[in-house]
UniProtKB/Swiss-Prot annotation:
It is found in: Cytoplasm. Keywords: Acyltransferase, Amino-acid biosynthesis, Cytoplasm, Methionine biosynthesis, Transferase. NCBIfam families: PRK05368.1-3. This is Homoserine O-succinyltransferase. Its EC number is 2.3.1.46. One of its GO terms (cellular component) is cytoplasm. Pfam families: HTS (PF04204). Substrate binds at residues 167, 196, 253.
Length: 358
C-alpha cells in the first residue's frame, strides 16, 4: 500500500521516480483508509543517512496491508554530524519530543557507526536507551537493526556482544528455525541476508535472555529473533534492508582506506557476493590500485558500470515478506489512537496470543 509524502523529504520523490507508490498528503486525507505511523530512528552516518531512509521506506511501502503508511524519521542530536547534515535533519526530521507527543504504531531503529570499545561509552548510548524504553511502553512493536539489536541485548538483557575474529561481511544463507511464528509465515525456509559487522550476539545469548530465535545461519549466526512476549521487539543482526549495491559501496570505501594508508591490507571480497566475473574485474583493479599507491599516482576509478548489472540481490523478496508480516501483525493489534500501543483486549505480555494454552 502507499507511502504518504507527509513532508518534503527528498526520499519520497526519489522513491516515486523508482516506481514506488507515493501519494501526496492532501490526496491521502481524502481517502477513507486507516493510517499507520511508523518511526525511523536513523542513526547512520551522514553519507548513509538518505540511503537508509530509502531502504526502509521501500520495504514498508511494499507491504500489501490495507493502510496508508506515514513514516516519521528522527535521529539523536548526540550523533556528530556535518553542518550540511544537521541542516538536512532540521529541515526534514522530527524531534524525539515530537515523536513522543504524537505517538507511533511501530518503530524501526537503524544501526550506527561506533567509535568506542564499549557501546555504553558511545555518546548516543543514554539517548538510545531512552528511546527504546519509551517505545517498549508506548509503541506496538520495535524492529532493531544490527547495532540496535546489540544495544538492546546489552542494556535490557545483560548480554554483551562479542568481538569476532574477523569481520562478518557478505551474503549468507539462513534457515528458519521456528516456522510457526507469524513473522516468517509464507517466507522461504532458506533465504539470504547480508551481514556487515565485527561483533555478534550468539544464539545461546539470545536464548539465555529468554528471547526466541526465528532464523539463523551456519556461517552468519543468529539473524532474526523476537522478545520474550514474541512480538514487541524484533531483532535483526543482518541488514535485510540493504540495496544490491550496498556491499559494493562498503568494499569501495575499504579500498580507498587501503589506498590512503588507513588500513594495512587490501580488503577481501565480501563473501558470497561477487560472481567469478566480477571478481576477475576487481582483481585486475586491485593491481592498478596497488601500482597507483606505490608510485603515488592518481587512483583509477572503480569500474562500477561493469559490475553493477551483474550483482545479484538474493535477499530483498524475503525481507519484503517479513516486513509485510510485521506490518500486518502491528495493524491487527495496534490501537486506533497512536498514543496507545494495543487495543483493549490485547495482552501486552502476549500480544499475538501465541503463548496462550490451547
Amino acid at each position: 500500500m502507499p507511502l504518504v509524502a507527509n513532508s518534503d523529504l527528498p526520499a519520497f520523490e526519489r522513491l516515486r521516480e523508482e516506481g514506488e507508490t507515493v501519494i501526496p498528503r492532501d490526496v491521502a486525507l481524502h481517502q477513507d483508509i486507516r493510517e499507520m505511523h511508523i518511526g525511523l530512528l536513523n542513526m547512520m552516518p551522514d553519507a548513509a543517512l538518505a540511503a537508509t531512509e530509502r531502504q526502509f521506506f521501500r520495504l514498508i511501502g511494499e507491504s500489501n496491508q490495507i493502510a496508508q503508511f506515514y513514516i516519521h524519521p528522527f535521529t539523536l542530536k548526540e550523533i556528530q554530524r556535518s553542518l550540511e547534515a544537521n541542516h538536512y535533519v532540521e529541515r526534514y526530521y522530527q524531534t524525539f519530543e515530537q515523536i513522543q507527543a504524537e505517538g507511533l504504531d511501530a518503530l524501526i531503529i537503524t544501526g550506527a557507526n561506533v567509535t568506542q570499545p564499549q557501546l555504553s561509552l558511545e555518546p548516543f548510548w543514554k539517548p538510545l536507551i531512552k528511546v527504546i524504553s519509551w517505545a517498549y511502553e508506548n509503541v506496538t512493536s520495535t524492529l532493531c537493526s544490527c547495532l540496535a539489536t546489540h544495544a538492546v541485548l546489552d542494556f535490557r538483557y545483560g548480554q554483551k556482544r562479542r568481538r569476532l575474529s574477523s569481520k562478518r561481511w557478505g551474503v549468507y544463507s539462513h534457515r528458519v528455525v521456528n516456522r510457526s511464528h507469524p513473522l516468517v509465515r509464507g517466507v522461504n525456509t532458506r533465504f539470504d541476508v547480508p551481514h556487515s559487522r565485527f561483533n555478534e550476539i550468539s544464539r545461546d545469548q539470545f536464548e539465555a535472555a529468554g528471547l526466541h530465535v526465528l532464523a539463523e545461519s551456519e556461517k552468519g549466526g543468529a539473524h532474526l529473533a523476537v522478545s520474550e512476549d514474541l512480538f514487541r521487539i524484533v531483532f535483526c543482526q543482518g541488514h535485510p534492508e540493504y540495496d544490491s549495491i550496498s556491499l559494493l559501496k562498503e568494499y569501495k570505501r575499504e579500498i580507498l582506506r587501503f589506498a590512503s594508508g588507513q588500513r594495512d591490507n587490501y580488503p577481501p571480497f565480501p563473501e558470497n557476493y561477487f560472481s567469478p566475473k566480477i571478481q576477475a574485474i576487481l582483481e585486475e583493479y586491485q593491481e592498478q590500485i596497488i601500482i597507483a599507491r606505490d608510485k603515488d599516482l592518481p587512483l583509477p576509478q572503480l569500474p562500477e558500470p561493469l559490475i553493477v548489472d551483474y550483482l545479484d540481490n538474493t535477499w530483498h523478496d524475503t525481507a519484503e515478506a517479513i516486513i509485510n508480516n510485521w506490518m500486518g501483525n502491528v495493524y491487527q493489534i495496534t490501537h486506533s489512537d497512536r498514543k496507545r500501543p494495543f487495543m483493549e483486549d490485547i495482552a501486552p505480555d502476549d500480544p499475538l496470543g501465541l503463548r496462550r494454552p490451547t
